[in-house]
Amino acid sequence: MSKVFTLNSDFKPAGDQPEAIRRLKEGLEDGLAHQTLLGVTGSGKTFTIANVIADLNRPTMMLAPNKTLAAQLYGEMKEFFPDNAVEYFVSYYDYYQPEAYVPSSDTFIEKDASVNEHIEQMRLSATKALLERRDVIVVASVSAIYGLGDPDLYLKMMLHLTQGMLIDQRAILRRLAELQYSRNDQAFQRGTFRVRGEVIDIFPAESDEIALRVELFDEEVERLSLFDPLTGHVLQTVPRYTIYPKTHYVTPRERILQAMEDIKVELADRRKVLLANDKLVEEQRLSQRTQFDLEMMNELGYCSGIENYSRYLSGRGPGEPPPTLFDYLPADGLLVIDESHVTVPQIGGMYRGDRARKETLVEYGFRLPSALDNRPMKFEEFEALAPQTIYVSATPGNYELEKSGGEVIDQVVRPTGLLDPLIEVRPVATQVDDLLSEIRQRAAVNERVLVTTLTKRMAEDLTEYLEEHGERVRYLHSDIDTVERVEIIRDLRLGEFDVLVGINLLREGLDMPEVSLVAILDADKEGFLRSERSLIQTIGRAARNLRGKAILYGDKITPSMAKAIGETERRREKQEAYNTEHGIVPQGLNKKISDILQLGQPTNRGKGRGNRKAAEPAARYELMTPKALELKIRELESKMLTHAQNLEFEEAAALRDELQALRAQFIAAS
């Protein structure tokens, strides 16, 4: 029997969690396609989902709206399931500029991208786990709806080696080259192999710490063993091993040759259309670019921008959806959409933006019309492909509610007994002076305040005003990158300052138990930032503090305010009733401040590791930008390989441990 999920936690489900777990499981077992979990801030939604996954033993994909929340989810799931395959699948681009054409200025912008190798390795590891195991949780961003290599071709290209099989060395090396592995007898790194006599060492593309040694005797595989690529220490011998391609986009030679013929046919048809419309420049440009791509594909098996021919390479018809990560998920897989009120609209919006850019490229002769089929999934295609789905949000959107038939599974009662914040509505006329008074009360007892305004100008003016009156205040705006944002949140929690002012301020995501007051200025101005869901999410930022309170400044109560206040009061009444019935005294959360910084730390799965760790140096890297972290990772990798080549294995192993901590920090930062 395949391995089951083993949930590792010191806690048992409490509050509304047992009932939510029971109802979700029953719904899934009864075949419900859509369920919605309405879980308030701090109610343990992730723990509830972890229990459902563990009980049902089904491979699961969890979608998050951005890399920060994906890294946070990945870290939490790693802790809950240390013995199972918890994988991370987000965009592997540190920087990405798609090709585009601006007709007004006759400017063509070439594609420019920087790929992060470590995240590429984690993506390959995720698809391998989905193909090989049942106990898999893949935490992904919306990157999951973008085109990926066809799983059928990917499986056909795999190289299976078993002990005792008859195969000569040349055949193995030829197959490795087809999988896009490169031979490197000097620097042994991911996606390479080396040959020493009748021994072939292969460093799998999806692995970060284990390599394969193939020992041949004449034309027979005598032994297969896994070893540490750094120290050369053999970890175990295995009866069989499967080597996966170095990239998801690998294609057999015969398919490439067939694709080239199809591209030539389309090019001839498109040239006729352009010439018939007197588009001579466009016709010449298209012919030149496409012929160059065809020559590259013939010689090398790929070309720059080969993804624009993906329709032919995967054998799809015009308009058919591209293969994506969803095609790798087993038929009985489970989909969990976190912060669904944000993630679902994101999925729907990806296709149109991509389409508009590509139509311009096709119209002006930079690409063939088939390039339009290199795209993310349409929303309808996502709906058709999605397995049984659980939507998770404190404020579910209309789509989720409609799909769930209006039924939501409430998770309102927190295991800690904490109540939703008290809400007060106060007049706008005196909002700034009233806020100053409230801030001083909170600062005196070492509590923090979040203030949300409607405009950037007002946020700047308010910050300046509070500073003039001696308050320790910072302003969070859109120009601040993810890493700096995490630093600001940490400084707020540490008490470096007392007030954080923003516009669309921290609605979903990182939580701060020290915040006891949320002030919403101009709450009576209906709009995107003052909608019912925005107000509930913002009010929820004070829900982890015993003295949590929200002040809405407005001269009238708008429909959105009325709904947000009504929903918060409903939750608070239910929480109070539960606490009274069970004799629970609310307890404030004491979340460690380091928790929000060390997101997605991979567990050390290696065997025979030394006790020397590199946590102390890693602490220095917390404030570095993703680019600086990447440069540091490359520098340490180079030093590590030098130590290994000089047989200084202790120093190399110490650097390897430091690299693991650095890579985890990089995931959190990017």
From Swiss-Prot:
Its main location: cytoplasm. InterPro entries: Helicase/UvrB_N (IPR006935), Helicase_ATP-bd (IPR014001), Helicase_C-like (IPR001650), P-loop_NTPase (IPR027417), UVR_dom (IPR001943), UVR_dom_sf (IPR036876), UvrB (IPR004807), UvrB_inter (IPR041471). It comes from the Bacteria. Residues 26-183 form the Helicase ATP-binding domain. A motif (Beta-hairpin) lies at residues 92-115. PROSITE patterns: HELICASE_ATP_BIND_1 (PS51192), HELICASE_CTER (PS51194), UVR (PS50151). ATP binds at residues 39-46. It holds the Pfam family Helicase_C. Residues 431-597 form the Helicase C-terminal domain. GO terms for molecular function: ATP binding; ATP hydrolysis activity; DNA binding; excinuclease ABC activity; helicase activity. CDD domains: DEXHc_UvrB, SF2_C_UvrB. One of its GO terms (cellular component) is excinuclease repair complex. It is found in: Cytoplasm. One of its GO terms (biological process) is nucleotide-excision repair. Keywords: ATP-binding, Cytoplasm, DNA damage, DNA excision, DNA repair, Excision nuclease, Helicase, Hydrolase, Nucleotide-binding, SOS response. The keyword Hydrolase applies. Residues 630-665 form the UVR domain. HAMAP family: UvrB. NCBIfam families: PRK05298.1, uvrb. The UvrABC repair system catalyzes the recognition and processing of DNA lesions. A damage recognition complex composed of 2 UvrA and 2 UvrB subunits scans DNA for abnormalities. Upon binding of the UvrA(2)B(2) complex to a putative damaged site, the DNA wraps around one UvrB monomer. DNA wrap is dependent on ATP binding by UvrB and probably causes local melting of the DNA helix, facilitating insertion of UvrB beta-hairpin between the DNA strands. Then UvrB probes one DNA strand for the presence of a lesion. Forms a heterotetramer with UvrA during the search for lesions. Interacts with UvrC in an incision complex. Belongs to the UvrB family. The beta-hairpin motif is involved in DNA binding. PANTHER family: UVRABC SYSTEM PROTEIN B (PTHR24029:SF0). This is UvrABC system protein B. The lineage of its organism: Bacteria, Pseudomonadati, Pseudomonadota, Gammaproteobacteria, Enterobacterales. The gene is uvrB.
